[in-house]
């Protein structure tokens, strides 16, 4: 009677789903109000002028314009939106 001993089961084989964090709109890119500029965990980037910050630290545009990243002397990177120049009518 030929028998085969039972094979062991692996305890590996799991991984969490990626959260798609990071910059969505880069420096100089045009945005409209509500556009997500970047997703992050914690404040790796800080909100500057014309941007809002969500409860999950997502930074989003409050006005139409171009995205701007600026590093201050203390090393903090601030994200802001430079408003588009309105056409004089």
From Swiss-Prot:
UniProt keywords, alphabetically: Ribonucleoprotein, Ribosomal protein
Any GO BP annotation: translation
Annotated S-S bridges: none
GO cellular component terms given for this protein: cytosolic large ribosomal subunit
GO MF, one annotated term: structural constituent of ribosome
Ranges for region Disordered: 1-24
Keyword Ribonucleoprotein: yes
Keyword Metal-binding: no
Database matches in HAMAP family: Ribosomal_bL27
Designated name of the protein: Large ribosomal subunit protein bL27
């Amino acid at each position: 009677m030929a028998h085969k001993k039972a094979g062991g089961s692996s305890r590996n084989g799991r991984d969490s789903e990626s959260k798609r964090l990071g910059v969505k709109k880069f420096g100089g890119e045009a945005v409209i109000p509500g556009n997500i500029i970047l997703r992050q965990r914690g404040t790796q980037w800080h909100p500057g002028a014309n941007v809002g910050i969500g409860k999950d630290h997502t930074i989003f545009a409050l006005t139409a314009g171009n995205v701007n990243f600026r590093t201050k002397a203390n090393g903090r990177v601030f994200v802001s939106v430079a408003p588009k120049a309105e056409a004089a009518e």
